[in-house]
């Protein structure tokens, strides 16, 4: 479970990414545009997830061999950093998906206001 303070920082990261998306690309004009953007972002999450699963597990397996052989030397970091890096990439891609969701929610809310 993620800590409360970390959850707050995650929310701040999503808000910041949302503001950056809006600043660079504006708001969505319709649901077709929103769908296309979120589909692309979700595909990037899937790619990052596959990379994480492959690279992270490979490095974790190598790390486990070192642990079993009681060979914990300076090279251990060479196996931990790729896990960190691929997890970081996956987290960044997920934040982008969350930001795009916020943009799409704004479009939905705007349409609801127009109906009222």
Name what the model sees in each region.
Residues 1-116:
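Flexible "arm" and connector segments at domain edges
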């Amino acid at each position: 479970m993620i800590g409360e303070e970390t959850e707050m920082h995650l929310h701040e990261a999503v808000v910041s990414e949302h503001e950056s998306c809006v600043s660079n690309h504006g708001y969505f004009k319709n649901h077709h545009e929103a769908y296309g953007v979120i589909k692309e972002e979700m595909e990037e999450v899937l790619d990052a997830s596959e990379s994480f699963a492959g690279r992270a597990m490979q490095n974790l397996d190598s790390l486990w061999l070192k642990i079993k052989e009681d060979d914990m030397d300076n090279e251990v970091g060479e196996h931990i950093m790729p896990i960190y890096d691929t997890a970081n990439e996956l987290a960044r891609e997920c934040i982008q998906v969350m930001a795009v969701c916020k943009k799409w929610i704004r479009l939905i809310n705007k349409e609801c206001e127009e109906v009222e």
